[in-house]
From Swiss-Prot:
Keywords: Ribonucleoprotein, Ribosomal protein. Part of the 50S ribosomal subunit. This protein is one of the early assembly proteins of the 50S ribosomal subunit, although it is not seen to bind rRNA by itself. It is important during the early stages of 50S assembly. HAMAP family: Ribosomal_uL13. It comes from the Bacteria. NCBIfam families: rplM_bact (TIGR01066). GO terms for cellular component: cytosolic large ribosomal subunit. This is Large ribosomal subunit protein uL13. The gene is rplM.
C-alpha cells in the first residue's frame, strides 16, 4: 500500500467562524492553529498546506485566566538600539484586540514559508461583523 501525499491543488478548504466571546485565549488559539495546519483532516501532509480558513469574531471579548490580565506582557522591537517596547494584555486588548489572538496563533504555527501561508488564512475581527459572508462559513464550536 502506498502512502497518500496530498497535493496543493487538490486540497479542499472550508471556511469556519469562531466566536471568541468568553473563551480562554490559549484554548481557542490551539484549536485555531490545529485547523489552520490541517491536522484535523485525514489527508494531512506535513509539507503541504491542508488547513482551512478561520474567521474569528468578538476578538475583544477573549479572556485569560489568573493574573494574566494585568501581568501578561507583549514585547515588540523597532529594530533600532533601545527600541524594545512592551505593553500589557489589558492595554493591548483596549487598543488592538485582534492582535492578541493573532500573536497567540502565530506562535503556534511553524516558522517559514509554509507557516506564513497558514497564518494568512486567519481572519480576526472585533465585533460580530465580518467581510466573508460570500464564502458561507460554517460555525465552529470550540
Amino acid at each position: 500500500m502506498k502512502t497518500f501525499v496530498a497535493k496543493p491543488e487538490t486540497v479542499k478548504r472550508d471556511w469556519y467562524v469562531v466566536d471568541a466571546e468568553g473563551k480562554t485565549l490559549g484554548r481557542i488559539a490551539t484549536e485555531i492553529a490545529l485547523r489552520l495546519r490541517g491536522k484535523h483532516k485525514v489527508e494531512y501532509t506535513p509539507h503541504v498546506d491542508t488547513g482551512d480558513y478561520i474567521i474569528v469574531i468578538n476578538a475583544e471579548k477573549v479572556t485569560v485566566t489568573g493574573n494574566k490580565f494585568k501581568n501578561k506582557v507583549y514585547y515588540s522591537h523597532s529594530g533600532f538600539p533601545g527600541g524594545l517596547k512592551s505593553t500589557t494584555f489589558d492595554k493591548l486588548q483596549a487598543a488592538k484586540p485582534e492582535m492578541i489572538i493573532e500573536k497567540a496563533v502565530k506562535g503556534m504555527l511553524p516558522r517559514g514559508p509554509l507557516g506564513r501561508a497558514m497564518y494568512r488564512k486567519l481572519k480576526v475581527y472585533t465585533g460580530t461583523e465580518h467581510n466573508h459572508a460570500a464564502q458561507q462559513p460554517q460555525v465552529l464550536d470550540i
